[in-house]
Design a protein with these regions (language model features):
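Secretory targeting and sorting signals
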Residues: 1-18
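Serine/threonine-rich, low-complexity linker/repeat segments that form flexible spacers/stalks
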Residues: 18-58, 76, 166-174, 198
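Hydrophobic residues positioned within well-ordered beta-strands of beta-sheet architectures
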Residues: 46-50, 63, 122-126, 141
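Short solvent-exposed strand-capping/beta-turn motif centered on an Asx-Ser/Thr pair
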Residues: 53-57, 70-72, 133
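A surface/secretory-pathway sequence property marking extracellular, secreted
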Residues: 64, 70-111
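Low-complexity, intrinsically disordered segments enriched in Ser/Thr together with acidic residues
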Residues: 105-139
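Serine/threonine-enriched low-complexity regions used as flexible
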Residues: 128-166
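Ser/Thr/Gly/Pro-rich low-complexity, disordered linker/stalk segments of secreted
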Residues: 166-199
Length: 199
């Protein structure tokens, strides 16, 4: 018979994502930023998404957009994209990649990021791998952009923040950082074998 403590051990091996979302307005537009896992482990991959909605008359076109992040996060190549009513648009090669931000230049692309007047929302998203960040400390994120109507808009420290703790398990290292079913099954089989051989 397997004790409750042993079962709890296997249950604890699977980590679940802890997303964080904030929404705010600047009179003319509304923004929502979501981090797929705000309490990741070292080695995990997280997705940061910024959603743009226009709440006043007239469209707003973005010339460029910066996604600010802690320098201990590493951008995942080819993950930056813009999603609008027409679908997904890759941002690279028109993407500047720096230790603490990435910046998309939409004056060079074949499409524009447009906040439609009470229309469908546009989204900018990118993936990052969590490196050797300070653990147990809130690390800020934010965004910044230039547009044809609002000019320079700076929310580079708006959030949400992430708090890193520990290292990821023997899973995929994806957004959840959870252990794979195969590794859990192998561990359970070993435990059962050990219990069966005891006198």
């Amino acid at each position: 018979m397997i004790g409750v403590g042993a079962l709890a051990l296997f249950g604890a091996a699977t980590a679940s994502a802890d997303p964080a979302t904030i929404t705010w307005n600047n009179d003319s537009s509304q923004y929502t930023r979501t981090i797929s896992n705000a309490t990741p482990a070292v080695g995990d991959t997280i997705t940061v998404t910024t959603t743009f909605n226009r709440v006043m008359i007239g469209d707003e076109n973005l010339n460029w957009f910066k996604d600010w992040h802690p320098s201990c996060l590493t951008y995942v190549t080819d993950s930056a994209k813009v999603t609008d009513a027409a679908g997904d648009h890759p941002v690279e090669p028109y993407l500047e990649i720096k230790p603490d931000f990435i910046a998309g230049d939409f004056t060079a692309t074949s499409y524009r990021v447009v906040m439609k007047d009470h229309g469908p929302a546009a989204r900018f998203s990118a993936k990052y791998t969590v490196g050797s960040c300070a653990t147990g400390t809130a690390l800020n994120t934010g965004m910044e952009y230039m547009s044809n109507t609002a000019g320079h808009v700076d929310f580079s420290t708006k959030g949400p923040s992430i708090t890193v703790g520990g290292t990821s398990g023997p899973g995929t290292g994806g957004d959840t950082g959870s252990s794979s079913p195969t590794s859990l099954l192998g561990g359970l089989t070993s435990l059962l074998g050990g219990l069966g051989s005891s006198k």
